């Protein structure tokens, strides 16, 4: 499945991290699997949705909001400009077990 709608874009930031970015036309989910020991097929971008979708099941990753606000290392994210959108209708971020 391709990432996002035509008005969205994806950016591969490192071999283990792909960010599906947001713009003013569409909201895209974000999945950062760099801290999980998963195979390459899990590194595909997530697709557009009202809320960031979970990582691939049955091996979920740590939710992005937890990764970006934790002390865990996130390689390749130092030079990325991230725009955060809060969506009250979304479920609260609860860290998953990797």
Curated annotation (Swiss-Prot):
<feature type="modified residue" description="N-acetylalanine">
    <location>
        <position position="2"/>
    </location>
</feature>
<keyword id="KW-0007">Acetylation</keyword>
<dbReference type="GO" id="GO:0045095">
    <property type="term" value="C:keratin filament"/>
</dbReference>
<feature type="repeat" description="1">
    <location>
        <begin position="3"/>
        <end position="7"/>
    </location>
</feature>
<feature type="repeat" description="2">
    <location>
        <begin position="8"/>
        <end position="12"/>
    </location>
</feature>
<dbReference type="GO" id="GO:0005198">
    <property type="term" value="F:structural molecule activity"/>
</dbReference>
<dbReference type="GO" id="GO:0005829">
    <property type="term" value="C:cytosol"/>
</dbReference>
<feature type="region of interest" description="3 X 5 AA repeats of C-C-X(3)">
    <location>
        <begin position="3"/>
        <end position="59"/>
    </location>
</feature>
<protein>
    <recommendedName>
        <fullName>Keratin-associated protein 3-3</fullName>
    </recommendedName>
</protein>
<keyword id="KW-0677">Repeat</keyword>
<comment type="similarity">
    <text>Belongs to the KRTAP type 3 family.</text>
</comment>
<dbReference type="Pfam" id="PF04579">
    <property type="entry name" value="Keratin_matx"/>
</dbReference>
<keyword id="KW-0416">Keratin</keyword>
<comment type="subunit">
    <text>Interacts with hair keratins.</text>
</comment>
<feature type="repeat" description="3">
    <location>
        <begin position="47"/>
        <end position="51"/>
    </location>
</feature>
<dbReference type="InterPro" id="IPR007659">
    <property type="entry name" value="Keratin_matx"/>
</dbReference>
<comment type="function">
    <text>In the hair cortex, hair keratin intermediate filaments are embedded in an interfilamentous matrix, consisting of hair keratin-associated proteins (KRTAP), which are essential for the formation of a rigid and resistant hair shaft through their extensive disulfide bond cross-linking with abundant cysteine residues of hair keratins. The matrix proteins include the high-sulfur and high-glycine-tyrosine keratins.</text>
</comment>
